Structures are given as C-alpha cells and as structure tokens.
Amino acid sequence: CGNNCQLTVNTFSDGGRLISGNRCERPITGKKDDGRWNLYEYKRQLILGYKPGENKRGRIGLPLCLNFWELYPFWHTFFTKLGFQVVHSPMSSRKLYLEGQGSIPSDTACFPAKLAHGHIEFLAKLGVDAIFYPCMTYNIDEGLGQNHYNCPVVAYYPEVLAGNCDCLKNTKFIYDYVGIHRPHDFTKKMTAVMEREFGPIPHGEIKAAVEAAYGEYERHMKQIREKGAEIMAAARKEGRRIIVLAGRPYHVDPEVNHGIDTLITQFGAAVITEDSVSQLADPFKTTVLNQWTYHARLYAAAKYCCSQPDMDLVQLVSFGCGVDAITTDETREILREGGKLYTQLKIDEITNLGAVRIRLRSLFAALEEQEET
C-alpha cells in the first residue's frame, strides 16, 4: 500500500502499544494481508521476480506503467535473449508521481497515464542506454471480442511522453509502432528497429528472442490463471466469498489501487482478477461493440460471476477514463441479468479510502442479507 498514513503510536513499559489516528487496520495484529488470498499481490511478485540479466549489448529501461504491468514478461524476455540488461522503474509512489508531474500536459488524462511521466523521469536519471516504450494499437487476440484494440491512452501515450518529457532530450527513447498480435510481421518490424538503434543483429537471434518472448507471455498468463483457480478452490474449502476485483493490468499497481485489494481481504474475502477467469466464460453477445481487449475480459469475468453463487465482481474505474463510460453500464447490465449486485469504485490520486470502505461494507452486508433470505 502506498498511502503511508500518519499514525500515533504510544508504547508502554510492558511492551504494549496503542495505535491511534490510523485510517486503516493494517497495523493491527491479525489484519495484515499475507497475500494468500490476494491474486493482485501474486501478480506484483511475478513482475518483480524478473532479473536484469547480463549487459552484453547495452541497458534497456522499461517503465512499469500502463500495459507494461502485463507485457513486462514479454519485453523482458525479448531483450534479455538478445543480450541486453533490462531494468524497470520501481512500483509507483507519490514521490515518483510528483517527480513527473511537471511534464503532464493535460489534467484530463487518467491517473495511471499521469504516473507514466514519473517512470520515464526515473529511467532517464538511471542512465540507461535507451528507454523502450512502444506504441501498440492492438493487443494479443484472446478471442473474447469483435476486435482486440488497446484503448487510445494505453496505445499511444508514448507519443505524449516523447513530446513533453524534457528528460528524453538526452536519453534515447524508442517508441515505434509495433503489433504483437501478428508474430510474423512483429519479427520483421523488431529486426528493423533493433538494427536502426543498436546496429545489425542476426535475424536468427531476433526470431529466437521473439519466440521466447511469446512463450514467456503465455507462461505468465497461465501462472495467473492457475493461481486464480488455486485461490478459488482454497476459498471454497474455507467458505470464503470470492471477489473479482476487475479493472486493467495497471490497477495491480498499489499507487493506483491504493490498497483496495488488501482492504477486501481484510473483510475475509479472497481477491482474484478478471484475467484469471475471463477464459472460463461461455461465449455471449454484448449490447455494445466489444473491441477492447481489457474490456472484453471485464465483460467475460462479469458473465462468469453470474454462474458462480459464491463469486461477486467489484469494478475499479480510473477517474477520467472515457471508455469506462461504456464499460460500467455494460458490466452493470450483465450482472443485473445474472442476479448479481454491481459495485463500482472510482479511483484517482486521492488516497483516502473512507468512502471505499463504506461501499465495501455495504456490499458485504447486502450479500449476507441475500444469503439469509
């Protein structure tokens, strides 16, 4: 949790402590989330578990923001296989946000996008040989929707960073348009990009790195689905309620979600993600054009929830997200038709979780009342 709430701790002569002024229950013994019931924490540890590798051809910096929360295993594997040392920016924090705040051109962007400026500032100061952050119109096609676009902010925010971050004047910033949804074309594109930026690299090496990257991405997503299934099975064995905390890959970032995942586990529920169950839903038709990869997962997860009596969905919405004006209505309708309650939590840079706690208490109280009747 990145909130860093101010606490008053009175320590007595017998070793006892009285904690006051706190806005959450994390300091209280027995309330801390150990990660056992939290798929968000598992996803964070997966990303942080990748090692930089050897520096044979240079150091590449990857910003841990937006779609890199999902694609980091892909790009890390690609570059390390080619002999690059891969370093990433740290998990977001208030300090990191403030460091990049001066280059944010518009206050209308969502908070996760604003955080990207701080990540770029960090990598530029780190002195890497290049920062790699490609523009990506498409995502990998998971077969859940009519198309597989990234939202405009995720797809093209590197253009905004290139035009506004002064720190990039002295740092190589690679933000070419690439498409991982077409492996053959992707290999050709990356061969050209790597030759332009780092000199000739044998095509065979590029091809092997691409194959390894796709394999690692599949392994990463499989790990998430398997861990989700493990948490669900354990929760059902103990009679815990299961909450699908649905959002985007970058909502795993503690500075973005403000510890809401941990807060839900403190209510005694297990927390899983939309991408851990989206493949389990039977095909169905939405009333809106289903063309965004992340949103297609959201709809599929909501549909799957409707078939599971012990599972409910809470949607995280970043303030300023234009596409969520559509997804919230569609998700609400899917859950309503399935007889489920819809809970939306709108989040931005404000860290006070008082209102969120009230919403969640109301949700769990309503669910208990439903069970009793």
Annotated model-derived regions:
Residues 1-373:
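An N-terminal assembly and electron-transfer interface module characteristic of large anaerobic redox
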